[in-house]
Amino acid sequence: TPFSHGITKRIINEDLSAFEYVFCWLGNTDLLVSIIKLIEDKMNLEHDVQEVGVQLILLVEDGIRFYSSILPNLYKFVLKQSQEFSTEALNAHQRTLRMRGRPKIVLARTYQEAMEIYHKYQNNILGVITDVRFPKVERGEKDGLAGIKLCAEIRKNDPFVPLIIQSSESENSSYAVKYGCLLYTSDAADE
């Protein structure tokens, strides 16, 4: 594959603090738009939430290959929905406002980062998509149930926010039922 597990393991031991995000090229040109949108969303998030009440989708994933493949699809869906919604506007100014008011997508790579984002923006969370296994803190060991713990904590505060758990292990379905989550299983989840 273009971004092997060997490369992923080498990156883990590197100091990447100078970089906001690391992506892998999987041949999808939509990744470039996703990178730009992700950075724009992060930069504009606080202003857009406070001033306009924009909602956000929280994606919790530490797998570079996985978030490099899901973000283009997620952005394509959100942008398409926003374009369709903006056609209902009465004039050009309203259309522009509706497009700018699209849900922001925020990527968290640890439990701690996800909880900080959740607590700061919990009234504007449109939904959460989470992996099951990721570190609790930056550069920490992976916790095999971090995503489940995240869903449990969020569910305590909000019984209605949509939660999606993505996992390569169907055994996690009992957790999904317990916390009222949708479980998406795939054989291609990144380690």
Predicted segments, located by residue:
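A short, hydrophobic beta-strand element within the central beta-sheet of small alpha/beta folds
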Residues: 1-9, 20-24, 61, 126-129, ...
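Short acidic, S/G/P-rich loop/turn micro-motifs used as interaction or catalytic elements
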Residues: 3-5, 29, 63-67, 112-114, ...
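Short, flexible/disordered intra-domain loops and linkers
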Residues: 6-11, 72-73, 136-146
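Receiver (REC) domain switch/output surface
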Residues: 11, 16-21, 26-46, 73, ...
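Conserved acidic segment of CheY-like receiver
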Residues: 53-65, 70-94, 105
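Acidic, metal-coordinating helix/loop segments flanking the phosphotransfer/catalytic sites
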Residues: 85-127, 135
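Short amphipathic alpha-helix used as the core "switch/output" element in two-component signaling
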Residues: 116, 137-160
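Conserved small/polar residues in nucleotide/adenosyl-binding loops
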Residues: 184-190
